[in-house]
């Protein structure tokens, strides 16, 4: 247990940006959920068992008459399909984590993935425990935010118009932090270019999957040039 205690202690400073972001977007989710007339306990339960970030924001609009089960499955897949690519890059690392790998797979979000790929393991801490601590703390921030937002939304009337932009804002902040922290920004430039091109070609509703495929293909082709230049541990 002392190993886990040290891992959580060392991991916490790295999760502070996620803490500030997840608390606010978790609160926003809770408020939106409560505005639909649902109990804040259900919002907390969803954050514990589903933990899908943008998928949960989308799910708020699914709990209405006329939305079919197939529509829910399709839209959720489209929103979260990028996680397939995240998982592929972390397969080797997760396979070394024993039973903890099942939670690591479940707890993989955009922000957690970013930390797992860019954070260097501090000395004196086991890698699997350190990465596990990051994932656990990130989800706890989301759950706490959902509880606060759900409770506040139940007790205080809110106008939630535009509140779902909080998730987009968090993505932008994390990207900017990554950009400023790196010397080699080729992968980021490729990501921006691929997204813009696919947005123009496929439209706003269908560009995510083609963008991810294009990014993976281009990075794979130029990987020999990037090796030794990039800091990411997910390469």
State the predicted function of each range:
Residues 51-54, 78-84, 170-176, 195-197, ...:
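Alpha-helical transmembrane segments and their membrane-interface exit regions
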Residues 3, 74-164:
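Helix-loop-helix junctions within the multi-pass membrane cores of secondary transporters/permeases
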Residues 128-211:
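Membrane-embedded alpha-helical modules
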Residues 55-62, 85-90, 176-181, 199-208, ...:
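Juxtamembrane membrane-interface segments at transmembrane alpha-helix termini
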Residues 1-11, 124-126, 223-235:
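Intrinsically disordered, low-complexity non-transmembrane regions of multi-pass membrane transporters
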Residues 37, 66, 96, 124, ...:
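Helix-loop interface residues and adjacent transmembrane-helix termini in multi-pass membrane transporters
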Residues 10-105, 119, 141, 207:
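Pore-lining transmembrane helices
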